[in-house]
């Protein structure tokens, strides 16, 4: 989709770049990249392309959205970000939360993701129930990512690769464990682990294993496991698309 990005002031651009530097320091110091990616994703992943509601527009600042079942633990990310947020009151929450996700991928060795500022904060959160359910398979993934958000099959598989970061916590998601042996490094090991089968101590969700059973998804899993550069290129594109759902559409 063609984008028509809003014009932002030079002062705003400078604030964003200074904020980016502060975020790099925080995320590296606190080892909190995974939860920053989760914050950005869960903010953006509520977008519905039919009603044009939800999306990456700062509504995670509301207690009501933080209270959604899928967002358990998100308040930890927001609390970590508060000291930086206070330094940049002119930056929208929408831009701030998406920038944190972009920087988190970069700091952990992942691809550089283009970031375009200018998102406006929406006044109310979306309804609960729009984020993907880890206990469901390919049809559900396509319902959420393709029909609801408007993303492609390639985007679905590339974005799944961000599970290379972080781990599940029983008290937040009902699941426990990391997908890879080094959950603070962004690389293609998620796909390698997926193809090698289940291992003691590592996690594979129903929604992960479903990628292997689909005739479109599986070749992409195999491609990304064999070629990290290809994964990085497709991930950067998919992450940018996710972070801009409903934003600057021409």
Swiss-Prot record:
Active site feature: 42
UniProt keyword terms in alphabetical order: Calcium, Cytoplasm, Heme, Hydrogen peroxide, Iron, Metal-binding, Oxidoreductase, Peroxidase, Phosphoprotein, Potassium
Necessary cofactors: heme b
Residues that bind heme b: 163
Cofactor note: Binds 1 heme b (iron(II)-protoporphyrin IX) group per subunit.
Keyword Metal-binding: yes
Tissues expressing this chain: Predominantly expressed in flowers.
Location of this chain's protein in the cell: Cytoplasm
GO molecular function: heme binding; L-ascorbate peroxidase activity; metal ion binding; p-coumarate 3-hydroxylase activity
This protein's record includes keyword tRNA-binding: no
Phosphoserine modifications at: 196
GO process annotations (BP): cellular response to oxidative stress; embryo development ending in seed dormancy; hydrogen peroxide catabolic process; lignin biosynthetic process; phenylpropanoid biosynthetic process; response to heat; response to reactive oxygen species
Site positions per UniProt: Transition state stabilizer: 38
EC number from the UniProt entry: 1.11.1.11
Upregulating conditions: By ethylene, ozone, sulfur dioxide, Fe exposure, oxidative and heat-shock stresses, and by excess light treatment. Induced by cadmium.
UniProt record similarity statement: Belongs to the peroxidase family. Ascorbate peroxidase subfamily.
Its job: Plays a key role in hydrogen peroxide removal. Constitutes a central component of the reactive oxygen gene network.
General remark: Binds one cation per subunit; probably K(+), but might also be Ca(2+).
Protein name: L-ascorbate peroxidase 1, cytosolic
Organism: Arabidopsis thaliana (Mouse-ear cress)
Taxon lineage: Eukaryota, Viridiplantae, Streptophyta, Embryophyta, Tracheophyta
